[in-house]
Amino acid sequence: MAYNLAKYIARRIKPYDKLINHEIKNSMEFKDIIDNIDIEEDEIVVNFDVSSLITNVPVNRALDIIYDCLESDSESNLRCQLDLYEVTKCLELCLRSTLFIFRGGLYRQEEDVAMDSPVSPIVANLFMHSLESSAVARSSPKVW
């Protein structure tokens, strides 16, 4: 049941992916961008790439970010019959339903987002976007 609910919620929050406009698709795209930039001696290149991003996203922060997206979207009710509170609670259920079997034992992942949920990639991308936006807001990058 949690998987089907996660698929439903994923379809509802997928439009927020459009908020992410600073994503480099591959190393060739990065090379093309960096080839056209003059980096001064007192400047640095920063990479926000994260290993194992999905399993390192804190659930509470992810819920806050999605809630903010939903709250600021005046058209979210057109995509979903659930209200803001209901969508958030369903998402929380999906993110906290992290049972898995290891060596015959049943375990629950205590923190962070599970890899196998349909909502996980969207939630991880929005979390990273929020983190990057916060970091960049405190500086004035030459390229972003």
Give the role of each language-model region.
Residues M1-N26:
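Non-catalytic interaction regions
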Residues E23, E29-D32, N36-W144:
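Conserved polymerase palm-domain catalytic core
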